[in-house]
Amino acid sequence: MTNNGSIELSKIRWRCRRGLKELDFLLLNYFNQKYTIADAEDKEAFLHLLEFQDPALIEFFADPKRIQDPGIRRIISEILGSNDGYQLK
């Protein structure tokens, strides 16, 4: 990986850091485990997801079915492992 590629990944990792540790955990897990092997479409969707503020992200994780953008819905569902959102059981 080039130095520029490494710097770009560091910037994306920094954008995964949020005001809530729960969001840090979810976003950083996806970034660390799946971002580098994701296809271009999923990378673009993840970067778009990072543009949202924390309250919107919380709503996305709570109910992914309500997300209008199919790319973001796919990333959220992949992070959660389902389309049903986070539920206490």
Task: Please provide the spans of the model-predicted regions.
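Positively charged, polar, low-complexity stretches
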Residues: T2-K89
